[in-house]
Amino acid sequence: MSNKQSRVPFGAALLGILTLLLLFETGAFAQTQVKDPLKLCKDVPAYQELKTQRLEAAQKAQADGKPVTFNEAGTKQKFERYDTAYCGQDGYPHLITSGQLDRAGDFLIPSVLFLWIAGALGWAGRLYLAESKGPEDEIIIDLPKAIKCLLLGLIWPVQAIPELISGKIRVPEDRVTISPR
């Protein structure tokens, strides 16, 4: 495969990502398009009622000596965090996925962390298979090699970008194994 052919999918992917970023609607615009826009939870009456009910239930359970997930202080702390979230008319917090940076802790940070961990595990598996001596290493795991690959997998973006640009990330068809059916 020539170097020019390997750059075509990368260029198309980059163009697609840039197009999505340019066409991405902001949260402010999305808020004007809904029937009942979200409000801060502390300003929603249904949320206040729910908060009162849960605090009273936590107090009662703690007084009765029942096991609870959150004691009264933990429940108060949970609802203090929810006070800054956005709620609908139902009183329940909603997850904001519009890309607003002030809500990055709700969705953006966990999703990027998930993708990074998934990429690290995939890259570690790829490294392990590349360094394996055959099917024996796949059946009986070589633990020192696996740990080394897992640690190297943590910096997978640094390793993946040069391979993606150079085209080394693609494996020839004859090296792709097909599992028995």
UniProtKB/Swiss-Prot annotation:
Assembly and interaction partners: The G.violaceus PSI reaction center is composed of one copy each of PsaA,B,C,D,E,F,L,M and Z, and forms trimeric complexes.
SUPFAM superfamilies (alphabetical): Subunit III of photosystem I reaction centre, PsaF
Alphabetical UniProt keywords: Cell inner membrane, Cell membrane, Membrane, Photosynthesis, Photosystem I, Signal, Transmembrane, Transmembrane helix
Name of this protein: Photosystem I reaction center subunit III
InterPro entries according to UniProt: PSI_PsaF, PSI_PsaF_sf
Stated role: Probably participates in efficiency of electron transfer from plastocyanin to P700 (or cytochrome c553 in algae and cyanobacteria). This plastocyanin-docking protein contributes to the specific association of plastocyanin with PSI.
Compartment(s) of residence: Cell inner membrane
Extent of the signal sequence: 1-30
Any one GO cellular component localisation term in the record: plasma membrane
Single GO BP term: photosynthesis
Gene coding for it: psaF
Pfam family, one: PSI_PsaF
Family stated for the protein in its record: Belongs to the PsaF family.
Parts forming coiled coils: none
Chain segments annotated as transmembrane: 104-124
